[in-house]
Amino acid sequence: TELSVTLVPKKRKYMEVENDMNTVRTKTKYKLGLALSGGGARGFAHLGVIKAMNEYGIRPDIISGTSAGALVGAMIAAGKTPEECIEFFHHTKVLQFARFTMSKMGLMSMCGMEEKLKKFLGVKTFDELPIPLVVTASDINNSISVHFNAGELIPCVLASCSIPVIFIPVEINGIIYVDGGLFMNLPVRPIRDICEKVIAVEINSIDSHEKVSNMIHMAERSFHLGLAANTRIDKKLSDIFISPENMIKYGMFDLNHIEEIFEIGYKKAKEVLKDFNKVIHTPIVIAN
């Protein structure tokens, strides 16, 4: 049985994580939850999906995100529009996000991303977010998924995005965390029992015959294969499943095709969500 915990202050209203099911328990029930998967730069497709949702008048009552999904989820939960998020990435160079380091724990540090996010989001804690957010990270020492929903926001988001070997892990309260996708790349389970319906967006397409050309590519490829393997349960638990096609050609750090990736997510969501009002009242899964 996979155990799971949440790190939150004791003397405050908070959500608890049920150890045997990876679900968040709360007296609050939400009509619609949105689960966003990890996938590196492919996460720009999440923003396209959310733009389509906005055009259809579909607003999530709670967001659950892993890795890139946690980053996008934090931005949207903070009240930013998809367009504002795209502008944020356009005006920030890669080396402002991640910097090479000599650390034995990872090739790059995300200290630059931390400062940029603080300024852009305009909030410091989960409680300040207009939309409730759950961020999934991996406790690498105890081999468990951890679902954050209170306390400081940005350290949790960075922990969720810390791809092993590539990025230096994030330490929170003495515990070392890495990318949430390691154990749960499509975080439907944390919000499944507290939402009437859940839309899940999975952006981690895999080419079964992809060639590996260098060390970074090998690490990226290996990680993506692991992500694909752990999404099956959560996919089945969603009510509407959106998986944009043609994502394979975009690498984890591809910031040169932001609009293309965004548009792929937007078009797929427009197609899948056109019958949202009919679909949301039936227990079926829409796949790509």
Residue ranges and their predicted role:
Residues 7-66, 74-288:
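Patatin-like phospholipase
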